[in-house]
Structure formats: C-alpha cells, structure tokens
Amino acid sequence: VEAIVEAVNGEYKFVEVSGPFGDKVKARFGVIRGNTAVLEMAESSGLNLVKRENLNPYKANTYGVGEMLKAILDMGIRDIYIGLGGSATNDGGAGMLSSLGVKFYNLNGERIGYTPEELKNIVKVDISGLDPRISEAQITVLSDVSNPLYGINGASYIYGPQKGATPQDVKILDKILENYGNIIDNTVGKNFSEKPGSGAAGGLGYALMSVC
C-alpha cells in the first residue's frame, strides 16, 4: 500500500473495524486521486494482529475486511484494490461476506455464523442481501499466490499451519472449505473454488472472485 500511495501522492485514511477475533482495531487504507482506494486485508485480519499463542483458525475471521470495504463505499469510492496476504484467517472470506450482507444457514434453516467453527454446519447461502454497491465497484485483487480454495495445494494445507492449525486441524478445515465452496459455487452457478488464487488469504480470494 505504501509504495502505491506514496508514488502518486495519495493520502491515508483510518477506520475502526473488527480484528480477527472481533476486537476493534484501527485499519489503514490509501486513497488515490480521491476516487481509488488501496487496502491490505491484513490491516483487519492479519497475522500481525495476533500473538502466536492466541492463533485459532476455527475462530479467526475476515469480518473486518467487509467493514473496511463498506467504509470505502461510504466515501463514494468504487475503484478498489485489495492486497491479499499475511492473513490469520481460514474462513474462505465468509466473515467479509457476512459483513456485506450474505447469510449462511444450517440444515434446520437456522442462520449460522461465519467462522470455520460454525461453517462446518453450512448447507445454504443467501447472497440476495449483498450490499448492492458491491456490484457498482471494480475490485481488483492483488495476490502473488495461485493456490485453489481446497485440496492438498489449497488454503488449509499450505497456509493453515502458520495460522495455528495442527495436521488434524488442516484436514478438518479443508473439508469445511470444500463444502463451503461447493455450496457457493452451486449458488452462483460457476466453479470458482478451483481457480488459481481462490485460496489466497485463507480463501478470501475465493469470496472476492465468486460473490464480489
């Protein structure tokens, strides 16, 4: 973000959003020429915000990323660049989607939360409540990884261990993301979960590709 913002004499903005575990953090993003925003998902959901002994891939989430996007949309900005990397999360971007109005349901038709701990019970997703301003925005994802959402080269297997996942956790988290991805793919009518980069930032790349 710094390199881009400073190269074009942009400015920094700060917004209070939810951290990886719901605690409030002050997240920074850049604004260029008044109509373009540049942000790093790690500002709200990064490993840098969590002590190693507190890492928990079942609870860490990207809700704050959605709050950052809403703050940017509130400013009237529709050209957005988002950097993916250094995340403490493995929620497939469900936190961000929930913040933007997407709902998840279990087999009993009850609404459930957006952490991997709760997503293990997902059978349905409702994207009809997605913030309509998202469709007006041009969101460009900046990522240097090509991992798919799930599988042995996916988000959980490759990056889960650095987020606190044990070998057993990795298998569980991978199954959660596989089911989650299949449900969203079926809902939107296209397979995004196997696309290169969908596994970036614990699957946040997938949520941005498939729904946003």
Task: Give the ranges of each region predicted by the language model.
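N-terminal loops that bind phosphate or other acidic moieties
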Residues: 1-84, 88-212
